[in-house]
Curated annotation (Swiss-Prot):
Organism superkingdom: Bacteria
Gene3D superfamilies in alphabetical order: Rhodanese-like domain
Keyword Acetylation: yes
Taxon lineage: Bacteria, Bacillati, Actinomycetota, Actinomycetes, Mycobacteriales
Organism, as annotated: Mycobacterium tuberculosis (strain ATCC 25618 / H37Rv)
Name recorded for this polypeptide: Putative thiosulfate sulfurtransferase SseA
GO MF: thiosulfate-cyanide sulfurtransferase activity
Residues noted as binding substrate in the record, renumbered to the chain: 250
């Protein structure tokens, strides 16, 4: 049975406030039946140096991705993962992580691929929890098998592929959420990260550049509904929007903002992103600060 939504007035203006919880709400419901807490970080070692009591760790790389094919795990593997982590199909899952929930949003997006009904983010994530000196532990909870059912992934509503992107160029909004250096073609990866994963640099023609981190404030919380509406004011209600980054993790954060905080009806994450596009043969690429135009073939 899903837990009640967080009634905090700080969340009420969002289109789907039930997709967020505050630290106060999580503290008050900690240990409640039907609540599963998940930590998913970019830095996969953080869980081991202290985490929210009762939280289990999901490693974005080893737990959610197929070990050989570039794809996500299948229904059988997801059910096994949920069993191992003690998560039931009808649990309320609250996910949090480092860096303004960057990777936590990615985990939430994967949960959504499998149709888990009630999955939420902790607003502010791990960093805000620690900044407020809330309780942490080194204890790893012992979980029992939940009998999570095998549910096949449903990619179509929220996942885009390369051909989908080619089909909408110039006709529907395309948002590049990477760093300015990546967008302009100066780098193939973020500053302070190794240059790897793509043979070409730049961005997809017509893509508007809005770095994912602009949706969060200095505390790691999401910006207000009003601020977010201004940031994405070019998106119309009937648009079919696609977001992308390098491997789909930063764009998952933007997907969450557009879908759950602003209520946009048709938003898909192109998780192939630049490590596919920047290696593909004969796809159009633009360098510089302007979105560019669709080339005439």
């Amino acid at each position: 049975m899903p837990l009640p939504a967080d009634p905090s007035p700080t969340l009420s203006a969002y289109a789907h406030p039930e997709r967020l919880v505050t630290a106060d709400w999580l503290s008050a419901h900690m240990g409640a039946p039907g609540l599963a807490i998940v930590e998913s970080d970019e830095d996969v070692l953080l869980y081991d140096v202290g985490h929210i009591p009762g939280a289990v760790k999901i490693d974005w790389h080893t737990d959610l991705n197929d070990p050989r094919v570039r794809d996500y795990i299948n229904g059988e593997q997801f059910a096994e993962l949920m069993d191992r982590k003690g998560i039931a199909r009808d649990d309320t899952v609250v996910i949090y992580g480092d860096k303004s929930n960057w990777w936590a949003a990615y985990a939430l997006w994967v949960f959504t691929l499998f149709g888990h009904a009630d999955v939420r983010l902790l607003n502010g994530g791990r960093d805000l929890w620690l900044a407020e000196r809330r309780e942490t532990t080194l204890d790893v909870p012992t979980k029992t098998c939940t009998g999570y059912p095998v549910v096949q992934r449903n990619d179509a509503p929220i996942r885009a592929f390369r051909d989908d992107v080619l089909a909408i160029l110039g006709a529907q909004p395309l948002i590049d959420v990477r760093s300015p250096e990546e967008y302009t073609g100066k780098r193939t990866h973020m500053p302070d990260y190794p240059e790897e994963g793509a043979l070409r640099a730049g961005h997809i023609p017509t893509a508007v550049h809005i770095p994912w981190g602009k949706a969060a404030d200095e505390s790691g919380r999401f910006r207000s509904r009003e601020e977010l509406e201004r940031l994405y004011d070019f998106i119309n209600p009937d648009d079919q929007t696609v977001v992308y980054c390098r491997i789909g993790e930063r764009s998952s954060h933007t997907w969450f903002v557009l879908t759950h905080l602003l209520g946009k009806a048709d938003v898909r994450n192109y998780d192939g992103s630049w490590t596919e596009w920047g290696n593909a043969v004969r796809v159009p690429i633009v360098a510089g600060e302007e979105p560019g135009v669709v080339p005439v073939v």
